């Protein structure tokens, strides 16, 4: 704040034991280890369910990045309806749902429906009557590794650069010049014809 009027000059009064409140990160390595242990504990707790949820394949926004596809937040309600899975039930079987996302591309819609159908075909669901020994025989998987997001192959490859004989620019330039110098060219041609006629008379 600027100095103004007959008021006392502002000053920061850091006298509240600020040295005790300085935040440091000396435990960075320890935190990393504890986060890893936490992930392992969570994975063991939910086993043999997948570690993560199935995500849709979406095209990245903006002109800069829309050439690539990536994993999205969740499947749309329309995509789930096409496969015949209720949104609430989808969350219980490891499928992420995003009710806000809208399908604006038929290509992406079809790709995600196929992704859901593939996941559904490989899904194993246990009921309460299933024995623990049967459950333990199944291996816990990482969904993002089992169903990876693959970049689509380009439809057309690189083409050779060909320079045509007639270009639009060249055609327009010739037409413009023809219009611009039409009168003077006609005048010169007329003068030349008259000169030749006089020469022939002599």
Swiss-Prot record:
Query: Gene3D superfamilies given for it?
Result: 1.20.5.110
Task: Kindly report the protein's main subcellular placement as a broad class.
Answer: cytoplasm
Could you state a single Gene Ontology molecular function term? structural constituent of ribosome
InterPro entries from the xrefs?
A: Ribosomal_eL13, Ribosomal_eL13_CS
Question: Quaternary form?
Answer: Component of the large ribosomal subunit. Mature ribosomes consist of a small (40S) and a large (60S) subunit. The 40S subunit contains about 32 different proteins and 1 molecule of RNA (18S). The 60S subunit contains 45 different proteins and 3 molecules of RNA (25S, 5.8S and 5S).
Function, as annotated: Component of the ribosome, a large ribonucleoprotein complex responsible for the synthesis of proteins in the cell. The small ribosomal subunit (SSU) binds messenger RNAs (mRNAs) and translates the encoded message by selecting cognate aminoacyl-transfer RNA (tRNA) molecules. The large subunit (LSU) contains the ribosomal catalytic site termed the peptidyl transferase center (PTC), which catalyzes the formation of peptide bonds, thereby polymerizing the amino acids delivered by tRNAs into a polypeptide chain.
Annotated protein name in UniProt: Large ribosomal subunit protein eL13
Please report the organism this UniProt entry assigns to the protein: Candida albicans (strain SC5314 / ATCC MYA-2876)
